[in-house]
Amino acid sequence: MEEWFHKLFKTRKPIIAMAHIPALPGSPRCRLSLEETVKWVKRDVENLSKARVDAVLFCNEDDRPYALQASPEQVAAMTRVVVEAKPISGVFGVDVLWDPYASMAVAHATGAHFVRGVFTGVYESDMGLWSPDASSVARLRRRVGAEGVRMFFNIVPEFASPLGGRSPAERALSAQVSSLADVLLVSGHMAGAEADLETLREVKKASNVPVLVNTGVNEGNLERYLEVADGAIVGTSLKQGGYTWGPVDPERAKRFMEKARSLRRHLDQSRSTLPGPPTL
């Protein structure tokens, strides 16, 4: 496991909670003023912090229909929201759907620790033919002096299917070798959908970097996911009524993190009782 990963999250099997941002100015679903949006997201982050999540990931989840290139007004609004709502002290990341360049720019401007995105591959998607370029994003990171911003590669993205015949394990290995992925993510078919456990196992087996489950995690399946993955990103199951685009439910978030901490203690105890090498 990467040393930086443990230094950043300061725990095994970190839980990264989503701060889903309501539709931003310019988006068809935008209903709130920017001030109201900031207030909404700050409340969510406060509730997540009270639940003691390990990190927060800001994402413009309700900027539907999704686009592959963020608009200037989206980037400006997202930057303001993150600056005003980010945790006072704590780890946080940025994901501007589905524009990795915008994600890196906003992350650098706001002091984020990581970005999540689709950086490699070619996909048939709801947004059309999708062919991201990890090399350009990595070079942008270098140009602006953001080398400390880690790149979390979603190699099984939502709302899309990969073209070609490579397996998830093959895509995972090549993303590490040719595109220098810091972390790999495995998702379900859409936001809130469970990731395929066998795919997660294949990717984990092929990986030398941390692997996180990216969607569909809830109290009921958390244990089996954490037995395989190095952590989880969770959003929908922490929301009021389990509705992806709703506000965070403080009680759901609290229960989820209590379950996560209990599972981590159990995993640590199991690890400590494993037999060591035979003595000579």
Predicted features by range, described:
Residues R139-G145, F159, N218-E223, E227-L280:
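Alpha/beta catalytic cores of nucleotide-metabolism and tRNA/nucleoside-modifying enzymes
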Residues T11, A67-V94, P132-F153, A195-N218, ...:
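Alpha-helix-loop-beta-strand connector modules within alpha/beta enzyme cores
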Residues F5-S33, V144-F159, L197:
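N-terminal small/glycine-rich loop or linker at the start of catalytic domains
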Residues I15, A23, V38-F119, P277:
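Active-site beta->alpha loop and helix N-cap motifs at the rims of alpha/beta catalytic domains
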Residues I15-A19, V56-F58, F92-V96, V115-G117, ...:
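Hydrophobic faces of well-ordered beta-strands that scaffold small-molecule active sites
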Residues D99-A112, R171, A206, V213, ...:
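Catalytic cores of alpha/beta
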Residues V53-A77, V122-M127, A181-E194, G241-Y243:
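Glycine-rich, proline-tolerant flexible connector loops at the mouths of alpha/beta enzymes
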Residues A102, H108-D182:
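Conserved anion-binding
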